[in-house]
Amino acid sequence: MSVKPAALFRISAALAVAGLGASLIASAALAQATSSRMQGLQLSNDQPIQIESDKLEIKDPESKAIFTGNVKVVQGTTTLQAGNMTVFYKAGGGSVTSGNADIDRIEVSNKVFLSSGAQQATGESGIVNLTNQTIVLKGKKVVLSEGKNVFVGCQLNVQMDTGEAQLDACGGRVQIQLDPQSRKTN
């Protein structure tokens, strides 16, 4: 099946939201509590997005596109990697092959890695819900880092439109390691 560039652009724009979710990763403010306001989502409409995978399967009747094996999405300094990624689009909102799909959510699984600049996040799976503007990253161990500052929990919830974020420990305790050298001096 051939995929039109416009279709890939629409998928890419949605994937940029997933990949750029990494820019929401831990700031020093998160050290004050497990619930905090994080940096805002910054999308770039003028940078190209590159998507690679071992396989792409488009299932228009099921309103989804499945990327399988070594999935990598890159835009500027932002990278999303996962073993698998499924893009769900709204029924009746157009098809991926026609280039006018209305993306509902993106699910990634099998060793998820998000990176934006000096910030990184890892987990076992994640969901970017474009309808309610949320990102959820889950795993036995979700690790957020920026330089030598490290935050560990099992689930990260981010409200993209407000920047509110919460890192849960899932029955254990949230772990935070801060490097005093990372503080900004005035």
Swiss-Prot record:
Tagged with keyword Signal: yes
Keywords: Signal
Annotated InterPro entries: LPS_export_LptA (IPR052037), OstA-like_N (IPR005653)
Keyword Signal applies: yes
Signal peptide: 1-28
Domain of life: Bacteria
Cystine connections: none
GO molecular function: glycolipid transfer activity
PANTHER family in UniProt: LIPOPOLYSACCHARIDE EXPORT SYSTEM PROTEIN LPTA
Name assigned to this protein: Uncharacterized protein R00383
